[in-house]
Amino acid sequence: MANKNVEVMRGNPETAVKKLAIPIMISMLLTASYNIIDGIWIAGLGQEAIAGIGFITPIFMILNGVSVGLGSGATSSISRFVGAKNHKKASQSAAHSLLIFLIASVVLTIVLLILQEPLLKLYGASGESLAQGIKYGTPLFLGLFAFIFANGASGILRGEGDMKRAMYAVVVSVILNAILDPICIYILGWGSAGAAIATILSSICSAIVILYWILVKKDTYVDVNLGEFKFDSSIAKDILKVGIPASMDMLVMAIAMSLYMIFISSIAGEFGIASFTSGQRLYLFAIMPLTAIGTAVTAVVGSSFGAKNGEYISRAHKFGAKFGIIFGTCVTLILVVFATQLSTIFAYTAETAHLVPEITRYLQIACLCLPLTGAGMASTFFYQGIGKGTISLFWTIIREVIFTVGATFFFGIYLGWGLIGIWAGLAIGRAAASILNYLYARYTIKGIRETLGN
């Protein structure tokens, strides 16, 4: 199985991006459903619970981003060694990735448990919403190791093109989460904390399944033997030169989201926060197919870069961008046309029904950026594929902080358009930055092809 996956990555780049993207897409949509499922069940707890957990969202984005980012570092490193046909280095990269996941889990758990309350207060949480946020966040952060290993180890499988088994582990996890959520929240009476506990238990199962394949069953392309492990700083650096910037991608987005929430809270208080975070759940769900395409681009570009094939690098990026635009357009149409119906998913009680019109407006305005975001996403992940994680981070900063935070402040605060201005700023900032990102990626690829001579 593993060798077939490797051959797909080394073959036709358009076919490879498409074949790899579909299972990643399913995995990511299922992973995003954690947030959706939690939101549906938590909606029954009232506006304070929705807002409180909404305040945790930026912090959750950071910890989830670290796990995905470190997984991206593993994917990039392993795929480049696979392209260069260096099996030993690919296996060493996988072993070093596991060590990095362990260290990150311990450090981040301690940091987030200490900082969660000050951060929630900074976002504007107080009273019951602050209590609900802490109640949800504490067990979530205690189980951080599960997220790190589940997402990180998936990155190892993706580095060798084994996307399907990464998807299977997620399927088990999501089904378990859907079963445990109502039990932990309502039957056991744990409320907000129950949603977090259900998510953590599900992630633990996902991590166990993937680590079993890699460490026990040993039927992967990479051959990890922890008993023979020897630390090699050059391999660790190769992983981290993509993994750290990729992790910081989500940190940057979390910082940007924190600023959006400060703007929104100053305009409309808990009502605005509840509307935004409910709509944001759907936006994050909708963007998963675009992220999946980008992740496939990382693996294929990494393999092509390792093989020094400039033509395949160019074709993989261009196809990924087109694929992303098509998916982004389809998703946008669904969100705009069915905005009202989708909004009621998170506001189905008498207490939260008044949120529906504003969630609807968010979906119909903020999500208009998705088609162009598809091209931008493929471009951001292209840089991870060639091992230039810092440039990938640079474009995330341009998109989320410079363009989008600037646009939301300009339209929402400076011009005084209120929440509609915030929603418009989200769409305009992200769309404009994505266009520039794509153009710069094409310029970079032109230089790579000239250097490689193909």
Regions of interest found by a model, annotated:
Residues 15-75, 79, 244-264:
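Signature of the first transmembrane helix
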Residues 29, 33-51, 120-127, 183-190, ...:
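Helix-terminus/linker motif at the lipid-water interface of multi-pass membrane proteins
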Residues 50-110, 147-166, 261, 275-339, ...:
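Small-residue-rich hydrophobic transmembrane alpha-helices
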